[in-house]
Regions:
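ATP-binding N-terminal substructure of ATP-dependent carboxylate-amine bond-forming enzymes
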Residues: 1-141
Length: 141
C-alpha cells in the first residue's frame, strides 16, 4: 500500500511564526512511518517554500536558507490535488498530496484562509474547515 502524502504547512506571515516552527518540528518528527510528509514553509513575508531538509533546522528558522528550498504553491486545480514546486529555471513539478495539515498559528493560518484554499483545491484538511476556522478566530463577529 502506498504511503499517504501529507503536506505540513508551517511558519506564516503572522506574529505567531516562531511558535508554528516549533509545532512543525514536533509534528514532523512524530509522523508515523506510513505517512510521507512534505514540509511546506511560509516565510514571515508570506513566501511559500518547499523544504526537503532536516526538521532540526525548522526550529531555529534556518530552514529558509537551505539551498534546496524552492518556491511552491498548492494547486487550485481539483484534478491535480497537489503542491506545485517551481524550480529556478522556470520548470515546475507537481507532488500529489492526500491531505494538508496546517500547523500555522494566528492570522493567515487559523482564520480560515488556508482552509478555504484547500477547500477550493479539493484537498482534505486536518483540523477545522474554513467556516469553523473563520468563526472561531474572529472574536469580534
Amino acid at each position: 500500500m502506498a504511503k499517504k502524502r501529507i503536506a505540513v504547512l508551517f511558519g506564516g506571515a503572522s506574529a505567531d511564526h516562531a511558535a508554528s516552527l516549533h509545532t512543525a518540528y514536533s509534528v514532523l518528527s512524530a509522523m508515523p512511518k506510513e505517512i510521507e510528509p512534505l514540509a511546506i514553509g511560509i516565510t514571515r513575508a508570506g513566501r511559500w517554500l518547499f523544504y526537503p531538509g532536516s526538521y532540526e533546522n525548522i526550529k531555529d528558522g534556518s530552514w529558509e536558507q537551505d539551498s534546496d528550498c524552492c518556491s511552491c504553491i498548492i494547486s487550485p486545480d481539483m484534478t491535480n490535488k497537489g503542491v506545485i514546486k517551481i524550480i529556478s529555471d522556470g520548470e515546475s513539478t507537481i507532488h500529489r498530496i492526500d491531505a494538508v495539515f496546517p500547523v500555522l498559528h494566528g492570522k493567515y493560518g487559523e482564520d480560515g484562509r488556508v482552509q478555504g484554499l484547500c477547500k477550493l483545491a479539493g484537498l482534505p484538511i486536518i483540523g477545522n474547515d474554513f467556516a469553523a476556522a473563520a468563526l472561531c478566530n474572529d472574536r469580534r463577529i
